[in-house]
Amino acid sequence: SQYEAGGDIALIDFQRGSNNFRVGTWQGYHGVDLIATVDLSEVQDINRLAGSFLQDQKSWIFMPKQVEFFVSNDGKNFKSVGVVKNHISQETEEPVMYEFSIDKKLSARYIKMVAKKIDACPDWHVGAGEPGWIFCDEIVIE
């Protein structure tokens, strides 16, 4: 990806992006879902899971349709623990950052986050019908 913010580890580096996607803290995914798995090395208690995303529709960057979180103790069998739907309007002109989060008491070693891409840039958009981008700067595990 052109926007890789230092590679896979960037999504768990505690470095938050600004509403300027050109700042090097954003991971960009073009026309694909974002699927990221974090290994905590051992089973840990978790109270909150979140993914931080950016929308800048003038640059073809849209919020995911939804973000789903999964947990596992073995890294193979994952259980869904929550889905967060997007409620940010695609027509918002200014860049906006939003955290898709769930508050739930969990215990797991592996966390998987799946952010579903939009089907295509909306009909009213200059890029109508073309794939959009998903930009994420952090996966939050508390």
Residue spans of the language-model regions?
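Short proline/glycine- and polar residue-rich coil/turn motifs
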Residues: 87-94
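Aromatic, loop-rich ligand-recognition surfaces of beta-strand-rich domains
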Residues: 16-82, 94-142
